[in-house]
């Protein structure tokens, strides 16, 4: 039996299908939990950051829909009380919901000339500073992300010493955004 050579477009299509299948299989593999050594290294990394700052204000930029970078910061800021879509999936490819959330946060920052004031609450497991942040006019970034339908409430039972009702305020904003199907809620609710 003679094997005929494939036409270049057919060979390319087969190669792409096989590559995608192997990439999807690799991405579906569960991640191994961190080893005790890795946890210890991460703990040492967080300790190297020093004490939690009392406050921070300065120029900030959006890294993703829930994380800020800023001038003079030793660690990134994770906005308290929200969870936005991940910017990149397990294959490190940016996805549309994550890009929309980051763009929305970037627009909020741009309207305030990137001037941000933050009140840190704690470090998270990734050594980011979890903080409630507001822009120049006093607008709460986390609340604005939730009200715009670009994030939902996350760990809202954690009480902030300076605003005990922040969690309830965020939950109310999420309810209204969901009811009005703002931002990403149509996709999250399966309408699209």
What are these model-predicted stretches?
Residues 9-21:
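Bacterial N-terminal signal peptides
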Residues 2-3, 23-192:
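Small beta-barrel nucleic-acid-binding modules, primarily SNase/OB-fold domains
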Residues 5-7:
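Generic early N-terminus positional signal peaking at residue ~5-7
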């Amino acid at each position: 039996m003679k094997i005929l050579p494939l036409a270049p477009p057919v060979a390319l299509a087969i190669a792409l299908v096989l590559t995608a299948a192997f990439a999807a299989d690799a991405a579906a593999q569960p991640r191994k939990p961190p080893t005790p050594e890795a946890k210890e290294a991460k703990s040492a990394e967080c300790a190297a950051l020093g004490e939690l700052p009392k406050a921070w204000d300065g120029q900030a930029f959006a890294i993703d829909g829930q994380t800020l970078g800023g001038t003079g910061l030793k660690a990134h800021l994770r906005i308290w009380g929200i969870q936005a879509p991940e910017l990149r999936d397990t294959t490190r490819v940016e996805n549309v919901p994550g890009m929309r959330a980051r763009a929305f946060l970037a627009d909020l920052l741009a309207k305030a000339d990137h001037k941000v004031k933050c009140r840190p609450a704690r470090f998270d497991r990734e050594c980011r500073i979890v903080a409630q942040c507001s822009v120049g006019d006093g607008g709460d970034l986390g609340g604005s992300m939730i009200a715009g339908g670009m994030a939902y409430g996350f760990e809202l039972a954690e009480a902030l010493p300076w605003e005990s009702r922040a969690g309830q305020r965020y939950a109310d904003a999420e309810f209204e955004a969901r009811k009005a199907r703002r931002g990403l809620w149509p996709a999250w609710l399966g309408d699209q």
